[in-house]
Design a protein with these regions (language model features):
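OB-fold and OB-like single-stranded nucleic-acid-recognition modules
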Residues: 1-167
Length: 167
């Protein structure tokens, strides 16, 4: 049986974030649990033009075995401003972070034009976060993925010179 491959590695400077420290509600499995959710954006090139977003849904302070969760600590340091970002502190003062993640789908129904449609947005989902002293010298190794997939359909798009689209 073939093992499914779904790994991404994002390595670069912390660009910005929208992380929040939250607490689970009274109807959750573990009420009152503090957790972090939101997005972290990483600039993977020296020119700060290739920004990759990683989404965290639910990161708690401890792992399922009760040990301290290192990723929670890194994300908490980002929230607390202990780790600088390009937007807040400039590129030279931004933390260098590596995130080992996976590609996931954020599927939901949306009411568009009076008709409910399934929306499937692809995103980097969570993963281990580690603070480093410097990013990989080779920019091509900073944003990598290793996935297997099945292509279920394709479509031909006609060339459009106005939009600079080849056939």
């Amino acid at each position: 049986m073939m093992k499914v491959r779904n790994k991404t590695r994002i390595d670069g400077r912390l660009y910005q974030h929208s992380l929040e420290l939250k607490e689970s509600g009274p109807n959750s499995k573990t009420p009152g649990t503090k957790f972090i959710s939101g997005n972290v954006e990483i600039a993977t090139d020296n020119d700060i033009t290739n920004i990759v977003t990683v989404h965290y849904t639910y990161v708690t302070a401890t792992t399922s075995t009760g040990k301290s969760n290192a990723t929670f600590n890194v994300l908490k340091d980002i929230i607390d401003g202990k780790l600088g970002s390009v937007m807040a502190n400039g590129a030279d003062n931004a933390a260098v972070i590596t995130i080992d993640s996976a590609i996931g789908l954020n599927e939901f129904f949306s009411d568009r034009n009076g008709k409910e449609e399934l929306v499937s947005a692809k995103r980097n989902e969570g993963g281990f976060a580690v603070v480093k002293s410097s990013a990989d010298e080779d920019e091509t190794k900073r944003n990598t993925f290793d996935v297997d997939m099945i292509i279920t359909g394709t479509r031909m798009i006609e060339a459009d010179p106005e939009k600079d689209l080849p056939e």
